[in-house]
Regions:
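C-terminal alpha-helical interaction appendages
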Residues: 1-74
Length: 74
C-alpha cells in the first residue's frame, strides 16, 4: 500500500491482527485503500484538534491511536 502514513499503517496492522474478517471484506469489495486513507485522515484531524486544545503531540497521537485507529467499527 502506497501513500499511507503511520496512522494508515497502524490501522492496517490492527485489522490484520484483530479483525481479519473485516480486512477480508474491505479487500473483497475494493475498499481497503479508501478505508485506510479515511482512518489516517481522521486520526490526523484528531491530533490537530487535541494539539490546538493544548495537548502535547505525542499524547495526542496516543489518543488518536485509541479513538480512531483501534476502533472496531467501520
Amino acid at each position: 500500500m502506497t501513500g499511507l502514513n503511520k496512522f494508515g499503517r497502524q490501522r492496517l496492522a490492527f485489522l490484520r491482527s484483530r479483525h481479519p474478517q473485516i480486512l477480508k471484506k474491505l479487500e473483497d469489495h475494493g475498499l481497503l485503500q479508501i478505508h485506510l486513507y479515511y482512518a489516517q485522515k481522521r486520526a490526523g484531524w484528531r491530533v490537530d484538534q487535541l494539539v490546538t486544545a493544548g495537548m502535547e503531540e505525542p499524547e495526542a497521537e496516543q489518543v488518536a491511536l485509541r479513538e480512531v485507529i483501534q476502533e472496531s467499527s467501520i
